[in-house]
Amino acid sequence: MSNDNCTGDIVTHLKNWNFGWNVILTIFIVILQFGHYKYSRLFYGLKMLVLWLLWPLVLALSIFDTWANWDSNWAFVAFSFFMAVSTLVMWVMYFANSFRLFRRARTFWAWNPEVNAITVTTVLGQTYYQPIQQAPTGITVTLLSGVLYVDGHRLASGVQVHNLPEYMTVAVPSTTIIYSRVGRSVNSQNSTGWVFYVRVKHGDFSAVSSPMSNMTENERLLHFF
């Protein structure tokens, strides 16, 4: 009889909460699937909020489980303590790497938990940032009728062939990688063509050049922090 009552309670609980969990999980699916900056800034902001809240939420739950099971279930205490320490370490690592990346690139993309590297392109006095997963060996820049694309992603319009930079940079938490222009095939008449950049050096450099500086482009890119 006790087992029947337990089963009945579980079925009743599922009936009462099934619709609510269905709605919550559907919202999570929409946020995770369409939470990209180019699709919807609202969903992207919600996605970042969920990711940022997961660390303190899991940490709080782990600490509570450790306290609740203290002196009654040491297996749960050990597991909860391990989860709390692991979450705290990952949280600290996130802030440390994000700060190091922000120190180089000076963009809010550095605080995105999904971003490991940022491509920095300066054209016509404007700096453009592109989040990527890892630093590439080479970067391909395409110019189609004055529209600038970096590895297939549109960055700017109204760009002429002579406006293309001599250098590009990619910032990662541990270093800044500088890419130099090594080859190109362009048509100046219709502002169409491609330019290829390869990495030439890396170090503790700023990934962002300052358009207000009187230094040359080369000097701006290579100045130390």
Curated annotation (Swiss-Prot):
Keywords: Glycoprotein, Host Golgi apparatus, Host membrane, Membrane, Transmembrane, Transmembrane helix, Viral envelope protein, Viral matrix protein, Virion
Virion surface face of the membrane: 1-10, 62-74
Intravirion face of the membrane: 32-40, 96-225
Annotated spans, Interaction with N protein: 199-215
Coarse class of the protein's main subcellular location: virion
Transmembrane residue ranges: 11-31, 41-61, 75-95
InterPro entries recorded: ALPHA_CORONA_M, M_CoV
Entry's Gene Ontology molecular function annotations: structural constituent of virion
Record membrane topology: Multi-pass membrane protein
Pfam families xref list: CoV_M
A cellular component annotation (GO) from this entry: viral envelope
Compartments it resides in: Virion membrane; Host Golgi apparatus membrane
HAMAP family in the record: ALPHA_CORONA_M (MF_04201)
Family the UniProt entry places it in: Belongs to the alphacoronaviruses M protein family.
Subunit: Homomultimer. Interacts with envelope E protein in the budding compartment of the host cell, which is located between endoplasmic reticulum and the Golgi complex. Forms a complex with HE and S proteins. Interacts with nucleocapsid N protein. This interaction probably participates in RNA packaging into the virus.
Its biological purpose: Component of the viral envelope that plays a central role in virus morphogenesis and assembly via its interactions with other viral proteins.
Protein name: Membrane protein
Biological classification of the source: Viruses, Riboviria, Orthornavirae, Pisuviricota, Pisoniviricetes
Gene behind this protein: M
